[in-house]
Design a protein with these regions (language model features):
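Short glycine-rich loop/turn motifs
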Residues: 80-84, 171, 232-234, 263-268, ...
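C-terminal regions of proteins
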Residues: 47-50, 54, 58-76, 310-320, ...
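Zymogen propeptides
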Residues: 18-191
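Bacterial N-terminal signal peptides that target proteins for export
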Residues: 1-4
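Structural recognition of the beta-strand scaffold that forms the well-ordered cores
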Residues: 124-128, 174-175, 236-237, 270, ...
Length: 347
């Protein structure tokens, strides 16, 4: 994983918890009395994939509603090796595997490689997800994880560069609500079981004093958090069809270690307006000669071009890995798969 801020857990007065349509073609009538069949919808509109190559057949049998594409040789003007899995969520299902760190005090639950997660469930698509760390013999998730409406981990709710001045950032989450709608938002967990979601991030920056601690009143528009399935990460890349890339407000620059303005392997998840989920991974760190990776701004632009209206960045670097029917896509930068705290699975 890209190193997330902390190697120690601060026990302060609060509870420390961790941290994004296919258009139907009009057919001519041969006979006004005989209805002609509609053309099948593409998983993503052709215009958005005109430079991507459908490589689904390279990975064995996939459900007809899941496709896998390889990127062109360049993305955002840089040499690239990237893959996307695109799933029509009107037919597909997604889920989260995560360690259970719901008490935010660390766990003995083991991290798992994506291959281990695949072997346990044989999901056609498995991709790494949230941030994490280990300390004092315990494993911690720094990112929200919700499975079957149960919170297994929360987005980390504090950050510091010197462990004297403490900030309380909101962090990105990608979720499916109980009614089946998808959304990207910012979240914050407070002690006492108070968990909120926001339409905008807390206005933090390392260059200023900490913003107010998030609450039911700040940032504006707070709602009690609720989701059927959710994964955290950051920064939030796209909201309501607009690029946000809020790494400054989420305090992902500086000491966070994810290097949002530098080229690295990346993982991200998003959804299009017509409920096509897109999981994205790109290679980096010269695993293929000349391929350094992408910035978070690059990833946001790519996902917007692919039609995403909501999207977030996930853990990248050595954690970035996507399996299709158990087969690797990108070359992972650690040389072998890293054991992680959470994954996204699609079938």
């Amino acid at each position: 994983m890209v190193v997330v801020f902390i190697s120690i857990l601060l026990l302060l007065g609060f509870t420390g918890c961790t941290t994004t349509s296919g258009e139907i073609q009009d057919w001519p009538w041969q006979d006004p009395e005989v209805e002609q069949p509609e053309a099948p919808e593409d998983i993503v509109e052709d215009a958005t994939l005109d430079r991507w190559t459908d490589v689904s057949a390279d990975y064995g049998t996939l459900p007809e509603y899941i496709k896998v594409y390889k990127s062109p040789d360049k993305l955002e003007g840089q040499k690239a090796v990237a893959y996307i899995a695109v799933a029509d969520m009107n037919s597909a299902q997604w889920d989260i595997w995560s360690i259970n760190d719901s008490e935010m005090s660390g766990t003995k639950d083991s991290f798992k490689t994506p291959s281990t997660v695949y072997s346990e469930g044989l999901w056609p698509i498995v991709v790494n997800a949230g941030f994490f760390y280990s300390s004092g013999g315990l494993n911690y998730s720094s990112s929200l994880a919700v499975r079957a409406s149960e919170v297994l981990a929360y987005n980390i709710n504090y950050a510091s560069e010197d462990w004297v001045t403490i900030y309380y950032p909101t962090r990105a989450a990608f979720l499916e609500s109980e009614d089946g709608g998808f959304n990207a938002c910012w979240t914050y967990y407070k002690s006492g079981g108070k968990h909120y979601m926001y339409p905008a991030p807390a206005d933090n920056t390392w260059e200023a004093k900490p913003a107010k601690t998030p609450s039911s009143a700040y940032p504006e528009g707070a709602e009690v958090f609720a989701a059927k399935t959710a994964i955290g990460g950051g920064p939030l890349l796209i909201d309501d069809g607009k690029i946000r890339n809020t790494f400054v407000e989420e305090l992902f620059n500086g000491a966070s270690g994810i290097g949002p303005d530098s080229c690295h392997p990346r993982t991200a998840v998003g959804v299009t307006a017509d409920d096509k989920m897109i999981v994205f991974v790109c290679e980096g760190r010269q695993m293929t000669e000349g391929v350094a990776g992408l910035t978070t701004a690059d990833v946001a632009n790519v996902l917007l071009d692919l039609g995403c209206v909501e999207a977030i960045n996930l853990d990248g670097g050595g954690s970035s890995c996507m399996l299709v029917n158990g087969k690797t896509t990108i070359k992972v930068s650690d040389g072998s798969q890293r054991a992680v705290a959470s994954t996204i699975m699609i079938k």
